[in-house]
Design a protein with these regions (language model features):
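Functionally engaged cysteine thiol sites
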Residues: 22, 32, 69, 73, ...
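Intrinsic-disorder/low-complexity regions
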Residues: 4, 23-28, 47, 62, ...
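Cysteine-rich, disulfide-bonded extracellular modules and peptides in secreted proteins
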Residues: 102-197
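Ser/Thr-rich, Pro/Gly/Ala-heavy low-complexity intrinsically disordered linkers and tails
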Residues: 19-106, 143
Length: 626
């Protein structure tokens, strides 16, 4: 089906600073909602932008709308009572001038409304004509089918009147599986999931997706699973579907977390390539209350694990820069990969590898250098695999409708030559949410007495990127092209990286035989301080030898983990921030929380003998202007 949210795209392209500035501590933004935005070719429009939201990378001819930003708050185009904000009564529309005793005549041929009567001004204080309107009158338009910007319900679909008043167009699906309904009094979606208000990792609509894994770890003894954290005081009903077919229904109690195993999708998990599209490959998870979702591949503590923070649909865009890891040649070769999941039918996805190309397993419209165009339908998953000498890091993904992107590796050593290999995966943050400054810190070793080394990749999301480090790091500082990156080898350094352009920063935990304690490779994306939050609810599988939450907090912040104060912060240079490695109790069910009186950033990880996982514990996803 066609998709052209022109009004929404105009808002997105012109109001990024407002969207970034308006978020509160919960990432709330007055111009967003979680109700499903429906594709349409006739949404009211004041402009027809055709340029991409980013001009730094490979050119895209489509904006990347943040889904749901045409919200239930109806701040754009109409009031919440379904009456056009632009309508007015009266017979003139003029203004009182100097020396006059009444309103100035309206200009000749201007159309004004007197109630439901359209009047055409004669320029002399009278009217050329007066026409009773059978349905509605709109200033400047005259008789119309509906008042532009007004809303109504068509079943459980919220409709908005087009700008020319010619009729209503579907805009929002008030999804009952997200606890919503359409209110006939104002034509808008109601319910907890209709009023999220902001862009963050908290949402009601997610697409968990199985990723490439070693074949002999795919099976019922090592289940793929999602952990759902209910952030509200009400029970959340969870519905999982796949390709429109029901998979399961579950309930997550208020303010708690539940791990929910899901069947493996063998077409995505097994083998080592080639690049392909798996129709209906993704699960769709919907909740009647706002929740957060993490996926574990697999759930059980094992020697080839990782985990990903899932991003709700209302935060997806059409622009991403990929972080992955190079093809590993041992044991016949294991590929790095990235995946793209579509929310809507007929989604056009263009992928462009960094530096013009990288060795890639061709397939599904992607060539042997990692470039191509692929069409996806709702729930379809494109998986792109590297081959000998290839690395998908820096690939630019551009789509004409919102998509989800993950990156990682089937199983790899970090660095090469250091035992053992482990699965890598992480959700990639949209380009629009990336920042120019990141604090990079290493994780803790299992004993909590020392820190574990990482390899850090800093990827340019825009061309002509210049890096600075505090303290300095011995790497190239100039990145000429989108997707170029620098790699800081095995290090336990804590530092800040800054740029005048947007960056993506990925950290890779080194293998156990590197000599930094129990663990194996795992992958995480650094979260910029601009996207920090004051509260988090998350899950750490209690069967791991040790689980930690790392907290980056402003100096002097009061932070609680599971209700206990955190006091072991150490300053991170002269940044004004401090770091705490907090060991999590494995005595409960895996539910944990972080609260603070200032915004903080967290990452969560677990380690065992030759095994580990790592993911960002959460973040806001406010739109950060270029």
């Amino acid at each position: 089906m066609a998709y052209a949210h022109r009004r929404l795209l105009h808002l997105f392209a012109t109001a990024l600073p407002l969207a970034a500035a308006c978020g509160d501590d919960n990432g709330r933004d007055s111009a967003s909602a979680s109700a499903t935005t429906l594709p349409s070719t006739t949404v009211p429009s004041t402009s027809d932008p055709t340029t991409a939201t980013t001009t730094a990378g490979p050119t895209s001819t489509t904006d990347a709308p943040t889904e749901g930003t045409a919200s239930a708050s109806a701040t754009d185009g109409g009031s919440t009572d379904g009456v056009s904000a632009g309508s007015s009564g009266g017979t003139s529309g003029g203004t009182t001038g100097p020396g006059t005793t009444g309103p100035m005549p309206c200009p000749e041929d201007q159309v004004v409304c007197d109630g439901n009567t359209a009047q055409v001004c004669d320029g002399m204080g009278g009217f050329k004509s007066e026409t009773p309107c059978p349905k509605a009158c709109a200033p400047g338009l005259g008789c119309v089918e509906c008042e532009p910007g007004s809303a109504q319900c068509n079943g459980q679909v919220s409709q908005v009147c087009k700008e020319d008043g010619s009729g209503f167009v579907d805009t929002l699906e008030c999804d009952p599986l997200q606890g919503m309904m359409c209110d006939p009094n104002n034509g808008l979606c109601t319910g907890a999931c209709a009023n999220l208000g902001g862009l963050s990792y908290i949402g009601c609509d997610y697409y968990p997706v199985v990723t490439q894994q070693l074949d002999f770890y795919v099976g019922p003894n090592n289940p793929y699973a999602v952990a759902v954290a209910n952030t509200t005081a009400d029970n959340a009903t969870i519905t999982v579907t796949k390709g429109g077919a029901p998979v399961l229904t579950d309930m997550v109690p208020a303010n708690s977390v539940k791990a929910i195993p899901l069947p493996w999708v063998n077409e995505l998990a097994l083998g080592t390539g080639p690049s392909s599209v798996v129709p209906d490959g993704a699960y769709r998870l919907r909740s009647t209350q706002p929740v957060t979702v993490y996926q574990f591949n697999p759930l059980n503590a094992d020697v080839t694990n990782d985990a990903s923070l899932m991003l709700p649909v209302n935060t997806w865009t059409g622009n991403y820069v990929v972080a992955a890891w190079p093809f590993w040649n041992d044991f016949g070769g294991y590929p790095g990969w990235y995946s793209v999941t579509a929310r809507y039918d007929n989604t056009k996805v263009t992928v462009q590898a960094a530096k013009g190309g990288t060795p890639t397993q061709a397939g599904a419209g992607v060539d042997g250098q990692g470039n191509g165009v692929v069409m996806l339908n709702e729930g379809d998953v494109l998986q792109v695999f590297s081959t000998f000498g290839g690395d998908g890091t820096g690939t630019f993904v551009a789509a004409d409708k919102p998509v989800q992107v993950l990156g990682g590796h089937e199983c790899t050593q970090v660095p090469f030559g250091i035992t053992a290999c482990d699965h890598l995966e992480e959700s990639i943050f949209p380009f629009e949410t990336l920042a120019r400054e990141y604090i990079v810190v290493p994780p803790a070793q299992a004993n909590g007495q020392a820190e574990k080394a990482v390899i850090v990749r800093i990827v340019a999301a825009e061309a002509n990127t210049v890096l600075t480090f505090e303290p300095d790091q011995p790497v190239n500082k100039n990145l000429a092209n989108v997707g170029d990156f620098v790699e800081i080898p095995t290090t336990t350094a804590k530092f800040v990286v800054k740029s005048d352009k947007k960056l993506l920063v990925a950290e890779y935990m080194v293998g156990q035989d590197a000599g930094y304690g129990t663990s194996d490779p795992a992958m995480v994306l650094a979260v910029p301080s601009e996207q920090f939050r004051t509260n988090y609810l998350f899950y750490a599988q209690p069967n791991w030898s040790a689980n930690f939450v790392d907290i980056i907090a402003p100096a002097g912040a009061n932070v609680m983990v599971d209700g206990a104060g955190v006091g072991n912060f150490t300053p991170i240079g002269a940044t004004g921030f401090s770091l705490a490695h907090v060991a999590l109790s494995n005595g409960g069910g895996g539910n944990h929380s972080v609260t603070a009186d200032q915004k903080v950033g967290i990452s969560v990880y677990g380690v065992l003998d030759y095994g580990s996982y790592w993911y960002p514990g959460g973040l806001d996803l406010a739109l950060i202007p270029q």
